Amino acid sequence: MLIVADDLSGAADCAIGFANAGRRTVVALGADEAVEAANDAAADRVAVIALDTDSRRLAPADAASRAAQAWRALGGTQGANASAGVGVGTSQRRLYKKIDSTLRGNWVAEVAALQPLAGLAIVAPAFPATGRTVRDGRVFVRGVPLGETETWQLEHAGKTADLQPMLEEAGLRTALFAVEPMRDLQPDLLAQALAEHARAGVQALIVDAQSEADLNLIARATLVLREVLHEAFFWVGSGGLARELAALPELFGNDAPAPVAPLRREGPILTLVGSLSAVSGAQCALLRERTGMAELVVPPAVLRNVDSHPESAQWRAAIGAPLAAGSDLLVRIGRDDAFDPSEGAHLSTALAALVEPHVCHLAGLIATGGETARAMLSQAGIGSLELLSEVEPGVAVAQPSDDVRRLTVVTKAGAFGSDHALYGAWLHLRGLQEATRNGSQADSQRAAHASRAPETNSPLN
């Protein structure tokens, strides 16, 4: 299985279902790491590869090119047409194009580039476990139309959030597919209905899904579509459909490689938050309330010119001091009147540069926002991750593939997760969940006390 994602947290939250199902799963941050993982897959050492193309902020044409190149290089396609980039080839590997459940990024251009190579795009971005559903080709976030949400208004104000016109604008022939009236059908009959759309020339089939049961039905039908009807297609979805696929034992052989065992670590935990969403803000507030850990809010003005700003050295030292002393720390990007969503990658890279000298002290890293996680791992020289488990849906736990850093990493998309997501991640890394289940309050209190440090928001106070 090859998962092609446009950011790191998305790659992880999509692929984690396969690790949970007992399949060894690697997230690669670049082409070289992905090729190495593909070689491991060919040698039956890896079952699932999730490649972060880092294309969310690129121009649509560049993002499309990266997605197509990834499939050509890693898809295992056979035949002259596939190798020439013309027509649909026969692939030894299944393709899952991961998209954001709130439709951020260049996913339309990427799907349009992949469709001629991989066949029918089965588009199902619903993720009911996180409140994302699809009805009549429209995404809803906890019952609210996507176009009316904070996330959409922040990044896409004035643009349509409906799936069908978005895909048709890219030149794809589309159709809507409602699962609700077909819920009583067996997967083989549902697969026949899917195949009819493919044979009618549909290039992107938009699938409604209100529940995990709907996604499970689609997952089972698509296996029939491939294995029995031999239709060429690829999945386009979020972590929701991926989890249902991962739960199907027939997707992999019985001898598929299993995940590696996690290694226990001791030391401070850094929570790094690049997202400015209200969701992340609430998660940070609860984390501080429950743990009492120190928080540093780095001004964007420092990050915009981190190499030359006169206060950069002070911020770097302020980040390092509590970590060197063994205390946990929350660091996040501030917001000012000059804020522009397009500068997110630059600010995240600058923040990672301030943190990098202190990574050696860390036992755990919690990174919120795909750009933030990728920037921090790149600065630390980590090119791929082995997925281990998850704290809650969409919050993945991993460790570096080579484990040179001896670091446990938790990744989460910014506007994602419950209010307890960051606190739950911290508890997971501290090992408090097991202690709490066993009623060991003394252990919990000792671990919590170890995280406390004097509260501060600026090294300049």
Where are these regions (language model features)?
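Cap/lid and interdomain-hinge subdomains that line or gate substrate/regulatory clefts
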Residues: R24-A28, P60-A63, A68-G79, T90-L95, ...
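Short beta-strand segments
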Residues: V4, A50-D52, K97-K98, I122-F127, ...
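Conserved, well-ordered active-site substructure
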Residues: T368-G424
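Short, structured active-site "lid" loops
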Residues: D44-A63
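N-terminal basic/disordered segments at the start of proteins
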Residues: M1-D44, A124-A129
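Conserved, well-structured core segments that form the ligand-binding/active-site neighborhood
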Residues: F140-Q314
